[in-house]
Curated annotation (Swiss-Prot):
It comes from Hydrogenobaculum sp. (strain Y04AAS1). The lineage of its organism: Bacteria, Pseudomonadati, Aquificota, Aquificia, Aquificales. Keywords: Cell inner membrane, Cell membrane, Membrane. This is Putative membrane protein insertion efficiency factor. Could be involved in insertion of integral membrane proteins into the membrane. It is a peripheral membrane protein. It is found in: Cell inner membrane. Belongs to the UPF0161 family. NCBIfam families: membrane protein insertion efficiency factor YidD.
Length: 68
């Protein structure tokens, strides 16, 4: 499951993300954060951390440096 999620995020980074303007307010980007957190915490907890990060990446959040 972990590898499937990472493959999905990599697909997003390579195929879909270049079609949209860069708008992530954090470093590392949300997709890179997702890969790091899934590798570190596993599919469920890492996926939840990535989901929470995506929810926080919006115009009302300051952003900044945020590692998993």
């Amino acid at each position: 499951m972990k590898y499937l999620l990472i493959k999905f995020v990599r697909f997003w980074q390579i195929c879909i993300s270049p079609l949209y303007p860069s708008s992530c307010r954090f470093y590392p980007t949300c997709s890179h954060y997702a890969i790091l957190s899934i590798e570190k915490y596993g599919a469920f907890k890492g996926g939840m951390k990535a989901f929470w990060r995506i929810l926080r990446c919006n115009p009302w959040n300051k952003g900044g440096i945020d590692y998993p």
